[in-house]
Amino acid sequence: MNLSEKDILYNWHPYTQHKTAFPHPVIVKGEGVLLWDETGKEYIDAISSWWVNPFGHSNAFIANAIYKQLTTLEHVLFGGFTHEPAILLSEKLAQILPQNQKKFFYSDNGSTAVEVAFKVAMQYFYNKGEKRTKIIAFENAFHGDTFGAMAASGISFFTEAFKGSLLEVIRIPVPTPENEKEVFETFRKLVETKDYAAFIFEPLVQGAAGMVMYAPETLDELIRISKANNVFTIADEVMTGFGKTGKNFACDYLIEKPDMMCLSKALTGGTIPMAVTSFSQEVFDGFYADDTNKALFHGHTFTANPTGCAAALASISLLLTQEMQDNIQQVNMQHKAFEQRIKTNPRVKTTRVLGVIFALEIKVENEQAYYGDLRNKLYAFFIENGIILRPVGNIIYILPPYIIYHVHLEKIYSAIEKALEEVY
């Protein structure tokens, strides 16, 4: 029995209907932007393996930091103990995040980072004697697959089986020039009820919705309205964080700053599962009391794992180099050049670019399912051509590692152009 057959026998893959799925390629090696399967076939990782790998596969700098930490202190419980990597990582995050972010709580992935934020927001008001248990989120948002995060997500078939078992979440449209006045008024009426603990958002880019982009000015206004009504704001930067939007964080485009931020994915350069939720001093002070019952009773076995912290410190060190910042801008310029080239294609409805993110929407007669026929044909076409792209319905997006070469980007662009001719 080969590896592919064993995979089918034993493994349950995410977002997969196994009865109809084709066997998955067995990846055996990664280097830079390239991956190889067991047959020797080469793939360009055009989406940074679900947006986690900005510095390339098998990055020696991060790997060495991990090895050094593994042979010094691989893990120690964070309840009742602390350690240098966590202290240094929190110090570094305080330096690069918005200045109001003062305290850091570590967890395991993006979903758990969101769960922490929700629990903190609700308990903050509980500690003050207020009952605020509702959340506001954007339509078509995606915040993760655990129960709280899933409740705030807007992709209906992800949550259909769990109706009645989720947090109460009210969704508002993403603001556009056409609807922003109505959105602001609806939002204001909601927060004035004093029923809401928090407003959560993916700043500037809704990733799983198809890289839907919106203006920072509109988000600034929503944050201002939230603050005026004592509703916490949670920036879910799990996808956008660590350079993807052209700045270190999407919140760097904002005048107003969130009360909490959720970070994961690229935090460790795609090496070790880890996440962090950051908080303003005001939020932390809501738990700082003589009463033990007002403490945050939440934790994970691998909270602030030293090896993960070491990987994150190395990853942030790479991000802040001038070379990597230049790489991000270079990818952005190449995306913009491709946008000019492709947007006149009669099969293309819209295009959009921010930082290293490129997306195009294909013209279709009928609305396409998230995992519909067109998407599946496009995905199979790209895999056949050695390109890892995962279209969302009729939207094709690129989010490559920052170290990608021009020749690899051109192969991706050419594959998209070819797909528009052959798959459409």
Label each PLM-derived region with a short phrase.
Residues M1-Y424:
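Conserved N-terminal phosphate-binding loop of PLP-dependent enzymes in the Aspartate aminotransferase
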